[in-house]
Amino acid sequence: MVKVYAPASIGNVSVGFDVLGAAVSPVDGTLLGDCVSVSRADSFSLQSAGRFVDKLPAEPEQNIVYQCWQRFCEAVGETVPVAMLLEKNMPIGSGLGSSACSVVVALVAMNAHCGRPLNDDQMLMLMGEMEGRISGGVHFDNVAPCFLGGMQLMLEENGIISQTVPGFDDWLWVMAYPGIKVSTAEARAILPAQYRRQDCISHGRYLACFVHACHTRQPALAAKLMKDVIAEPYRTRLLPGFADARQAVGDIGALACGISGSGPTLFAICDRQDTASRVADWLTQHYLQNDEGFVHICRLDTSGARLMMD
């Protein structure tokens, strides 16, 4: 049997709409991500378990994991009979890369089960394609960090899909999911078709300078540049309490705060454990809306999708 875990991811990371993503994992060892187990079988089967299993489609054929199995078999040119078990530990429509997580973990598990017939580039192309079935268009800002780990910048030039942007070891990423769902399609539809020239210039400056600050090891500058002029001004209205939360965590001492993907999860970056704990406490008390919500203090997950030992 092969068992694979893939971590949650932050799409956009505020400053890099559709071109920057980061994988995160809780510091306390909680699995904030999906697991898939694959075993030999006479015929295909898919079972689901986990905290958020009731949010999955009732019919296995509608599950993206089943579709990933189908597409993987097409890619390798043979039907591979397996029994798959999906452990859904990620809420759907959360802004944590839930669909990307299921795509990555399913394809990595199948590839490992079959002796890795596909290389990383082939896998990443498949992942982007499968993610596109759910999000409506091929993009890699969740699947790339989920698969490869760390913070990934989408290049999509010279045959290179993404490359790593170095993060900062002392950054703690406080992730707060309020327990409500935001449709990615709705969050995209609310964005304007055209942007002002000044916004385009600002966006380019923030992203270029952020990547520069990461490579030249300037954490204070990098945090200062984590500004979103593309999505956040419009998506805030879809996220009850986000504006107040951003102000509050900044007052506590967070270096930056933004929307994870299309929301409703937010992230706040801190460089001290005591600050992160205070931010987490405030978000737990004021940003969560029901029992499905949660807050985790995380670090960048530099490993990405990986085999697990039972």
UniProtKB/Swiss-Prot annotation:
Subcellular location: Cytoplasm
Reaction equation(s) it catalyzes: L-homoserine + ATP = O-phospho-L-homoserine + ADP + H(+)
KW S-adenosyl-L-methionine (keyword) present: no
Chain sites annotated for binding ATP: P91, I92, G93, S94, G95, L96, G97, S98, S99, A100, C101
GO cellular component term, pick one: cytoplasm
Pathway: Amino-acid biosynthesis; L-threonine biosynthesis; L-threonine from L-aspartate: step 4/5
EC number: 2.7.1.39
Protein's GO biological process: threonine biosynthetic process
InterPro entries: GHMP_kinase_C_dom, GHMP_kinase_C_sf, GHMP_kinase_N_dom, GHMP_knse_ATP-bd_CS, Homoserine_kinase, Ribosomal_Su5_D2-typ_SF, Ribsml_uS5_D2-typ_fold_subgr
NCBIfam families named among the record's database cross-references: PRK01212.1-4, thrB
Free-text function comment from the UniProt entry: Catalyzes the ATP-dependent phosphorylation of L-homoserine to L-homoserine phosphate.
Name this protein carries in UniProt: Homoserine kinase
Gene: thrB
